[in-house]
Amino acid sequence: MARDDYQKALKKGERSYARYLSEGKYPYLQVLEELLSHTDVVAEEDLGICSIPSEMIVGTFTAGRRTAFAPNFMPLLDDESEFAAKWQALYNAHLEEGIHDPIKCYEFMNRYYVLEGNKRVSVLKFCGAPSVQGNVTRIIPKRTDEPENRLYFEFLAFYKCSKVNYIVLSKLGGYRTLLEKLGFDADYKWTDDDRMEVRSLYVRFEKVYKEKGGEQPPIPTSDAFLMYLELYPCDPNHEEKLPSQIKSELLKMWDEILLQAKGNPSEIKTEPQEAPKKNLFDYLLSPGTKYLKIAFVHDKNPQDSAWIYGHELGRMYLEEQFKGKVETISYNDVSQGAELDRTLDDAIAKKCNIIFTTTPQFLEGSIKTAIKNPSVKILNCSVDTNHQCIRTYYARLFEAKFLSGLVAGALCKNGKIGYMADYPICGMIANINAFAIGVKMVNPNATIQLEWTTVRSKQEILEDFKANEVNLVSCLEMIVPNSPSRYFGLVNIEKDEPENLTAVIWNWGALYKKLVETVQNGAWDSAGSDGVALNYWWGMSAGVVDFICSPKVPVKTRQLVEFMQHQIMEGGFSPFSGELYSQDGIVQSDDNRSLTPEEIINMRWLADNVNGSLPHWNKLNEDAKAVVEVQGVDNIEE
């Protein structure tokens, strides 16, 4: 019997060997000694006896035995060899009494390499053992900025508090989100009961997930587990979920899992879509314009928040433009979590066809509700999300900020210009850099001092600017109704009273009108294709963003700005075309290439004439952390 099973294991090994070879991959076990020869190691840590997930044991420590095993740890030596005899004896012992002696191995970058016990691992994997007991030594590499290295150090922080090694995530920030969804603080030390409870949930989820997706599901189980928890967080009362409930919830989100498996393909619509052409039968059968009921869900109120004030102006404009055809309702001061869920459910109960959630913080709740209610159109005000069940919308500001930079550069006399930014989120870096490029185009020696209002107060920043003779400052572009201020847009702060020179205008009314028109004219249904997430990112050419230049700006400078604005709106110029330089060197050298919308939105570098950096996570205020958690650029340091 053991000989027959060895031959089965041998065939599995030969198939694995052949597959790896045909794919141009190394067809034997990985050797840790060889990997470490190219790695800076800073420490070793004894982890003691651990339960190691079998799938995470990928190699051997030394090169001596590597050719005896295929990459799946199945044997490659013929069944007459001494190796085969020892393997069969170990196999018989396992069937009779089990393998009790732990292997000795090293853990490096979340993978395990065997020092003693290769045949034990081979037998246990052949028998389908989900885990192997091992005495583990962790090898810790030098910390770097490489994404894989940063992700590993995030895992180390997670392991330090949880002692959990079977959850291996692939995205930066994932472990922080996981802890949040499990209901744990980042520095909370897990108890044995905590570990048992999470393990139980994970095992139940894994069973349901693999029943649906097979033994090789669309994405790794750990990543799917995190996606599941993001939509269905743990019950704070620790009520155990039944497999039937997990299955029902998993089926609702399956399209989102498939989308992630494809690499989260998304499409950014930079211009409103035209209505699809209709033939005679379409006109004859058309029921006419549909009456729409639309909900706006805000996290603050328009009296205290410039952001919400702008959206409320857009909502009122919408009702005015579609009298008798559109009804809107507004929800203010809605908190994340249960209150948001109740609010969205209430909007759906009131027969809303469209729901706008006006902050990136509501993205997760929007997705959760959209999955449960596919007939309702839910849009979140954020940029470049990768979810098929909802769509996102945002104003494209960087082109207008470039024009503001032109004015700042032209008027700057001492080479010092200030820039106040708020959230280090996707799209914001492009605004900063476009402004800096505008400055450089007309004043190559000027520099921009970058400051963050979510780290320091606006008043403190302005005082520092004045003390350092930074007289021209790009301030935030919105005004709070209850706290009006002239510090918006490009401002000259040299005198006692601020002098406004330019302003970038968010025209939310135009944006909402065009979004509603895409629903009414059929462009919504014709846009995009199955399996692609859609994001609306409209700017000056769509009338969603406007740029105002004060008469105080010299006439020739205004003419230059008007010319460049026309070129941008006609598609004849992009601030991010040709050679581009960051603080670290050249970003793009091709004179004939422009950055794509995706590259602009996900920009991670600052222009070479910017003095400053992205803020440290711990320096951000709590409001900013909540936004950055969802839409932040991924090189914000912990």
Please describe what each predicted stretch is:
Residues 1-116, 126, 171-184, 214-276:
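Short, charged/polar connector segments at secondary-structure boundaries
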Residues 293-313, 318, 331-337, 425-429:
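Extracytoplasmic "Venus flytrap"
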Residues 522-638:
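Segments of small-molecule ligand-sensing domains
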Residues 97-113, 119-151:
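A short, basic-hydrophobic beta/loop patch
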Residues 315, 403-443, 530-552:
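An alpha-beta-alpha
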Residues 393-415, 505-525:
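Hydrophobic alpha-helical segments within soluble ligand-binding/sensing domains
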Residues 371-394:
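Flexible loop/hinge segments that line or gate small-molecule binding clefts
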